[in-house]
């Protein structure tokens, strides 16, 4: 049996790569997170540089005190906020909504959840093997 590829299927996949990720902050406020393909070269490079900052955060040990864990959590939020300033249409509103969470660990998890959703939804993926 041969595989049949349709232009419509290709179109759908290509459009998905260029579509923004929409994050609803409230009933009337939505923030768009632009995919890397829609960013200019300087902005793309800046996003990559921001992600390199994660290497500067030391690994946590099981016996680290709560204050240190909270400090690292806030560092994670600061790094991800830099990325949001580059990719979001309304970065101040997005960051303000995330910063409403008072617990630094939960806040860091929220930041990471939004970032990971953006990464997952806008990934470029790998080329599919050609049918032989």
Swiss-Prot record:
Membrane-spanning parts: none
GO biological process: viral tail assembly; viral translational frameshifting
Family named by the database record: Belongs to the L5likevirus tail assembly protein family.
Encoding gene (name): 24
Lineage start: Viruses, Duplodnaviria, Heunggongvirae, Uroviricota, Caudoviricetes
Coiled coil: none
Protein name as catalogued: Tail assembly protein Gp24
Subunit annotation: Interacts with tail assembly protein Gp25 and tape measure protein.
Pfam families hit by this protein: GP24_25
Function according to Swiss-Prot or TrEMBL: Promotes tail assembly by creating a scaffold for the tail tube proteins. The tail assembly proteins Gp24 and Gp25 would wrap the linear tape measure protein to create a tail assembly scaffold. It would allow polymerization of tail tube protein during which Gp24 and Gp25 are released and therefore are absent from the mature virion. The tail assembly protein Gp25 is produced by a rare -1 ribosomal frameshift. The ratio Gp24/Gp25 is important for proper tail assembly.
Organism per entry: Mycobacterium phage L5 (Mycobacteriophage L5)
Keywords in alphabetical order: Viral release from host cell, Viral tail assembly
